[in-house]
Regions:
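Generic secondary-structure signature for well-ordered alpha-helical cores
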Residues: 4, 123-127, 184-188
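A conserved beta-strand/loop element that lines the FAD pocket in flavoprotein oxidoreductases
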Residues: 2-13
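Beta-strand segments within the central parallel beta-sheet cores of soluble alpha/beta enzyme folds
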Residues: 11, 131-133, 191-197
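A Rossmann-like FAD-binding core segment of flavoenzymes
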Residues: 24
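Hydrophobic/aromatic beta-strand patches that form the interior of the parallel beta-sheet core
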Residues: 7, 37, 159-161
Length: 201
């Protein structure tokens, strides 16, 4: 609607022209932009490192298992505080969640965490059969639990929006709105200093 284009490509490197315009190399193209934003969730650190900005982004890995066909056992999400897990009824069955770790992007799935989720679910519902699906997701996490939103300290035409922890879907839209206004030179009337990458200098 606004003249943008969606392209699904893997970003490999980011460099800058003599006039500090971002040059982005993907797996299939080379692009030069007036301005660019790194908003790649847990995968953002690779690119922020390339522009010599050491932001201490880590990867909080969350797990879930799925029991197909047992959604009739619950009518609403339940948190079992004593054992530290939750179960949510889905259209396709029950989703069991409740374990995280700092494990990076490349380490394999930790089977002990899957077994723990399965055992906890069967403690609550002994009638559960074999689970159908195991999932591992990556949450971009920073030491102070605040995202990075705003310009790079090293390049005036590069901006950041990542590190939203468990709230990426929740805060992504408002972060994008704030950042787009900032890039366009609009007055946001917000104090964004707590979200600046400068706090890690």
């Amino acid at each position: 609607q606004k003249g943008g284009k969606f392209k699904k490509e893997n970003v490999e490197t980011i460099n800058f022209s003599a006039d500090d315009k971002p040059i982005v190399k993907t797996n299939s193209n080379l692009y030069k932009f007036d301005k660019a934003t790194i908003a790649c969730g847990a995968f953002s650190k690779k690119l922020s490192d390339q522009v010599n900005e050491k932001i201490p982004l880590d990867t909080e890995r969350g797990y879930h298992v799925h029991f197909k066909g047992y959604d009739h056992l619950l009518s609403r999400p339940v948190i079992f505080l004593n054992r530290g897990f939750g179960i949510t009824p889905m259209e396709q069955g029950l989703r069991v969640v409740g374990t995280v770790e700092f494990g990076g992007l490349k380490n394999p799935l930790n089977k002990k965490r899957i077994i723990n989720l399965v055992n906890n679910a069967k403690y609550l519902f002994p009638e559960l059969g074999k689970h159908e699906d195991e999932w591992l997701g990556f949450r971009p996490t920073l030491p102070d639990f605040l995202p990075v939103i705003g310009p790079s300290k090293n390049h005036k035409n590069l901006f950041y929006s990542f590190g939203h922890h468990h709230l990426g879907w929740t805060l992504g839209a408002i972060s994008g709105k704030i950042l787009s206004g900032m890039i366009a030179g609009e007055n946001t009337n917000l104090n964004l200093e707590p979200y600046s990458s400068l706090r890690f200098s």
